[in-house]
Regions:
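C-terminal structural segments of small proteins and small subunits
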Residues: 73-90
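C-terminal end-helix/capping segment
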Residues: 89-102
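Short S/T/G/P-rich N-terminal loop/turn motif that feeds into the first structured element of a domain
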Residues: 1-77, 100-102
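A short linear hydrophobic-aromatic micro-motif
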Residues: 39-41, 83-85, 95-96
Length: 102
């Protein structure tokens, strides 16, 4: 179990293929964060990213901070965000990582 006094992060990389679905997804994320005390640290398009290594595969990226890794996972598995995930999957291809901060 993650230490509750260390923040947790959700990191997203998304290649958008359906902009309308992505817009719908984005409108659902912020309201889903509030009950979990989540806050968006950064949400950017490719123009605001610098690819240092590897092959660019995403045109959107986001980092969301939570009070702990456990709370980040609770949010990710919540019914509200699960609904948003289904729409995100229609929007394109994504990679999501949950990680503990220091």
């Amino acid at each position: 179990m993650a230490s509750p006094n260390k923040p947790g992060y959700a990191v997203f990389f998304i290649q958008v293929n359906n902009p309308d679905a992505y817009t719908e997804y984005a409108s659902l994320v912020l309201p889903s964060l509030k009950p979990y005390q989540g806050r968006v640290i950064s949400a950017v398009s490719r123009n605001d990213m610098r690819q240092i290594e590897g092959v660019p595969s995403s045109d959107r990226a986001a980092i969301i901070e939570f009070p702990s890794l456990d709370i980040a996972e609770e949010w990710y598995k919540s019914s509200t965000y699960t609904h948003a995930t289904a729409i995100r999957n229609k929007a394109g291809v994504s990679q999501v990582v949950l990680m503990r901060g220091r």
